[in-house]
Amino acid sequence: MDDGFAYTTIGHRGLTICNPIGSDELDSIVSLIVTSGPPTGRALDIGCGKAELLIRLCERSGWAGLGVDPNAAFVAEARAAIATRAPGRVEILEGTADQLSHATYDVAAALGASHALGGTEPALAALAGATDPGGHVVFGESFWRHPPGAAALEVLGMPADELGLLHELVATVDAAGLEPLEVVVAREHDWDRYEWAHLRNLEAHARSHPDDPQAARLWARRERWRDAYLRAGRDLLGFALIVARRR
């Protein structure tokens, strides 16, 4: 398995939500969509991971969903969950957004997947283009909690312009022709649980594969990020889900 997919796949073992948003917060987003959308809508999730957003949406409504993700392991887990929780309601494709038709949806989402769409602004343009007028976009993106200093940026290995502050992120959503309706920010303890679960999974994998060079590489990568997270990321990085209506 490619190191990139292996790192993500192993790190997310046992996790259904592939970002630091808590389960209650995801539920609040689903409730907002269900109560303000049509009774039988269609939802698209690009970079859907294990499709938890789509599954919850279809569990609680008459909606149907389509998700796409390039990670074969995530696709398999998503399909298994759909078979028991939302059979026949959600379709998952293994691949990228390039493979999708130009159909539009009542909801288009990308949670932490803007990199797959060329960055924040191109991702928002793609989501707006995939959403019917009056429909919803759900956009998950990282942001700076406060302006980053040079020392923290060096620890994280990130340029200052890679992310914006939360108000700048919301303004970018607004500028894409989308009316922000709700912003849900990952709580610190949910992010901690996410990070440490990810770390435990990779540590367990390295322990159970002592002679595997890939396992050693993945664990070394995780140790580097653990250090960066504790020294700078925990204080500086935020993650938000933004629900917006297409104008």
Enumerate the predicted regions with their spans.
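Short alpha-helix
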Residues: 162-177
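Short, glycine-/aromatic-enriched active-site segment of Class I SAM-dependent methyltransferases
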Residues: 142-160
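Conserved Class I S-adenosyl-L-methionine
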Residues: 184-247
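Class I SAM-dependent methyltransferase SAM/SAH-binding core
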Residues: 44, 50-98
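A short acidic, Gly/Pro-enriched loop at the edge of an enzyme's catalytic core
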Residues: 98-108
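A short glycine-rich, Lys/Arg-flanked "PGG" loop and its adjoining helix->strand segment in the class I
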Residues: 121-136
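A short SAM/SAH-binding and catalytic strip from SAM-dependent methyltransferases
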Residues: 107-119
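Conserved alpha-helix/loop element of class I SAM-dependent methyltransferases that forms part
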Residues: 19-39
